[in-house]
Amino acid sequence: MFASVVLLILSFFDVVFFFIPSPVDPILNSTFEKKTPKFEGALKVNSMLTKTERLFEGKVFGPESMAVDSKGTVEFWSKCGRPLGMRFDRNGINLIVADAYFGLLEVNPETKVVKILLPPATGFNGKPFRFVNHLDIDEDGTIFFTDSSAKWQAHQASYSFFEGDKTGRLMAYHLKTGELELLMDGLYFANGVQISPEGDHLLVVEYAASRIMKYYIKGENKGKSEVFVENLPGYPDNIRPSSSGGYWVAMSMVFTEFNDMLMYSYPRARNFLAKVFYLPWLVNFAGPNYGLILELDRNGHITRSFQDPTGSVVPGHISEVYDDGNVLYLGSYQSSFLGKLELKD
């Protein structure tokens, strides 16, 4: 009887492994190194995020990104796809939106008129934009934006992450001329974008690589790229300026040895797991319920961190930090509230 059960189980695994197609094609992520971080120094465990106030709880779902006008007006729009990044144009009039399904949009908050600037089908070199994610705008009106994957769409983000997909792109859309330019490709889940205060380089988040790249858009290094910071203690989402002159990085998930094994190593095992489990559930299961945001200086060093180790108030899934000098506002791609954390008592 026991032998029959064992044989049946082995037969099941044989069928799954050899005959059932996998929805992903996992690769060994060997171009970057991950080490389980030590929570010491600027990463010393604290509970600062437990002081966060929940705004609009139950009235919003997945408030991924924020943009603030000169009046501080709160607006809700229902007619959209999945906006993942927002910035006001340099005139402070129109809101430019990176929408995962509709591409780049221009929204007039006063008239509520929505204009499609760059539909996903436009693409580049025959590859449509499958997953427009985040953006920033320079003084000339050029929109720098990321396309997280040339293969997967937003509702398939877990598949891109689990697979180790490196088809992400950094693009420049020159509004004045209508020219579209490829700046970087081969990115591991390209995510947040931030122009430096000097305007000479961009910081581009590679979510699945747990690192941030620097790409020069001006000066003698124009067109070159380098690592700004790597081996972050989790998976970074968006990056925004801090009031102290550095940058805030929202961490969507804290890194552990378990999710390292699950997401980075053993491609054949990941291939098998993708056949057996629902990947969005599996990826969520891999991450601890831990809220974390980081402040970086201009050189990419972590200067401080705010944490919620138990996830009792801010349960991870943080997508963006907006700093107005007195308050941090925390966005999320999954939570049903917008976080508000007072910086000064």
Q: What do these predicted regions represent?
A:
Residues 68-72, 88-92, 137-140, 197-199, ...:
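Residue-level detector of Asp-centered blade-edge/turn motifs that repeat once per structural unit
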Residues 108-112, 174-178, 216-221, 297-301, ...:
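Short loop/turn segments that connect beta-strands within beta-propeller blades
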Residues 77-81, 98-161, 167-168:
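Asp-box/WD-like beta-propeller blade repeats and closely related beta-sheet repeat scaffolds
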Residues 233-311:
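Loop/turn-rich, solvent-exposed surfaces of beta-rich toroidal or solenoidal domains
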